[in-house]
Amino acid sequence: MYKTKAVFNLKLKQKFVFIFILFVFLSLQGYSQRGGFKWSSDGNSYYRIENNSVMQYTLPENSAKVLISKEQLTPKNSSSPLDVRYLISSNDEQKVLIFTNTKRVWRLNTKGDYWVLDIAKGSLTQLGTSLPESSLMFAKFSPDGKAVAYVSDNNIYVEDLNTSDIKALTSDGSTTLINGTFDWAYEEEFACRDGFRWSPDSKSIAYWQIDASDIGKFYLINNTDAIYSEVVPIEYPKVGETPSACKVGVVSIADAKTTWMNIPGDSRQHYLVRMEYI
């Protein structure tokens, strides 16, 4: 009886651990969505967005405190706080990137507006104000915390956080030449969305460029956004057709010059789905 009970308790504990790990995995996969959470850099606490504020829960007691209040998330000349989709902290956790006013791209809301909250100064500043509304994608702090890079309309930009100066690192982006993100095929088949990486020294950015100019178009009908339908063309390679060309380059923050990597193989027949600094 006791042996059976012990085995049952062990299996129950194992099941609990499995469920907890699965919960953590799914939460981390989707922490960008409201209701998820994000671990602190030291692993001793985690953050959640609750009631328009950011809460910090410290382990093991799971004690809670307001890390960022809704007043801190309220822009000047506004009576309501930002509708936060997700948060990204700088390496020193003194600044926070806030993603809001989002729009769907294919399956996920990856376009939107980004704001930077400087916790020490208490300042809340919108990024990319000279670019179209809700057009910024995949904003990331530089490792030194002095700048933020993001994609808008298939070009990559870097914004100095001290001066708010915005520099275009690429300028050839179009609906078929895609810098810093991916086309439908890469997202659908490989879950590739975020298409650039900061270098550890904050002096350059490595990025993907997708050339879909020779891909045949698949036409969709948009019947929902207006009283008249609209034809929406999508570059969509059918089975047996040649897919998009892909290459990886490294662009200098100082002069915006790109050095293309010499990668063996056919750029249209060989997929490049992962790339990181090591």
What spans do the regions from the language model cover?
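Beta-propeller folds
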Residues: 30-278
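Bacterial N-terminal signal peptides
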Residues: 17-27
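N-terminal secretory signal peptides that target proteins for export/translocation
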Residues: 1-14
